[in-house]
Structure formats: C-alpha cells, structure tokens
From Swiss-Prot:
Alphabetized CDD domains for the sequence: THZ_kinase
Enzyme class: transferase
GO biological process, one term: thiamine biosynthetic process
Coiled-coil segments on the chain, per record: none
Job description of the protein: Catalyzes the phosphorylation of the hydroxyl group of 4-methyl-5-beta-hydroxyethylthiazole (THZ).
Entry GO MF terms: ATP binding; hydroxyethylthiazole kinase activity; magnesium ion binding
Name the record gives this protein: Hydroxyethylthiazole kinase
Pathway(s) the chain acts in: Cofactor biosynthesis; thiamine diphosphate biosynthesis; 4-methyl-5-(2-phosphoethyl)-thiazole from 5-(2-hydroxyethyl)-4-methylthiazole: step 1/1
UniProt EC number: 2.7.1.50
Amino acid sequence: MFDFMTLEKVREKGPLVHNITNIVVANDSANGLLAIGASPIMASAKEEMDELAKMADVLVINIGTLDGELVEAMKIAGRAANVAGTPVVLDPVGVGATSYRRKVVQELLAEIQFTAIRGNAGELAAIAGEAWEAKGVDAGVGSADVLSIAEKVANEWSTVVIISGEVDVISDGTRFAKVANGSALLPRITGSGCLLSAVCGSFIAVQDDAFRASVEACASYAVASEYAELELERKLPGSFRPLFLDALASWSVEKTHAKAKIQESGEHK
C-alpha cells in the first residue's frame, strides 16, 4: 500500500503550507518544509486568515506558545479552512501541561474539523481523557495503551491520529500502522515533532487519503533522520541538526523503501 510516491507529489506540486506555529520552531519548520519541496508561509495575523485559507493547500496549527490573539487567529483560520475545503492539522503541544492549554484545545476541537492530529503519547492521552503523567511539553509516562488512545481520539473527532515516539502509531480509527524508524537524536533537538506535524501537513495536502499520507510522512521523516545520523562523526545534537536538514532535502523513494519499517493492520485487537 505504501509506495512513498506522496513524497514525489510534494516535490512536484510544492504545496503551500500555512503554519500558525510557535516562536521556538518557526525558523526550523520553515527550513524543513523548504527542504522537502513544500512552500511555507508563517502567518498569524487574524486579519489575513480568511484570505490565506483560500490560498493555502493545508493549514497547520501548533499551540506551542499561546496567547489570546493567536488563539483567535487559529479559530478564524481553522473555520475558514473548513469552509474552503483545506485540510487542517493540529499539533497540541503540551496540552496536558496546563488548564489553559487544555481549554484552548477543547475549543479548537469543538470549532474546527481537523484532518489530522499529531502529538506525543502524553498529549494525545490528555485529549483522550486518559491518565498520563505529562512532563511539560514532553511525552512523560503513562500506562494507557497507545493504540487504544489513537483509536479513541480518531473515532471521537473523525480524524487521523499520529502519536510520535520511539515507534510512531498512526490510526484513522479503523486502520492502524506502526513506524519503527528514527534516530535517537531526534528528541534531542527542539522542534523535531513540530516539523513532523508540518511535514505530515504537506503530505496530506497532496494525497487524498490522509491516513496513507501520514504513514508515509512519518516513515520518510524517520528514515531521513537515520541517514543523517550515519553521516555523523560524533553523535551530538548540534552536528545532527544541519545533517538532518540535508537528509530531508535528499530524500528519495528508494532510500525510504530500503529502510522503512512499517507494520499495518486493519483493526486494533
């Protein structure tokens, strides 16, 4: 099922990815999107959200650094994107960390139909209402079954769920996939998950099947990180970051096919 041709479609079409994102990761996300062949726009003024919804091929909402004006812009953009038929991706950064973040995400979910939600296990557990010990914006620890969390959120919100971790879990509520790739250095650079959300958005923009797009995005991204690590003389995050950007720019279908470890199933048992 997964031929990774979505990657080639991203390069051919250069989708316009509208990011309402946080101040920590904006630069890295923009450069990462450029590396894979997408076209990023990092805009958050509420006055231009309606126009951008008609221009963009996908909207990616990231709640990493919130304020009231930004939340209002997110809501306007999300509603306008829904009207325009533009897919919308949510990255609920640290949703379990504070009551304000939980409130904002609840409001966004109530007002916007999201095509996909990508986060770590702690973030998706918070959305699912499952017990989990969050550690700020990091995944933290919990005993809930990650596949069950993905299934619950996907079905409740009619969306594709991407739970990032040592093994990524992707589900649309009826289909499930695990991606067992990725460099151990990815969690050591800030914004690697946020960039993955944007990359998933760019794949979804050019592929009608959001589940397939998300699986291929996760696998391609993780495999690129493994190739980047192979180029390192010393396994340090500062050296890894630019090599990872180069690996994203030199992605190929053949490279991804050669290393991707995907396990797919039709149902969660």
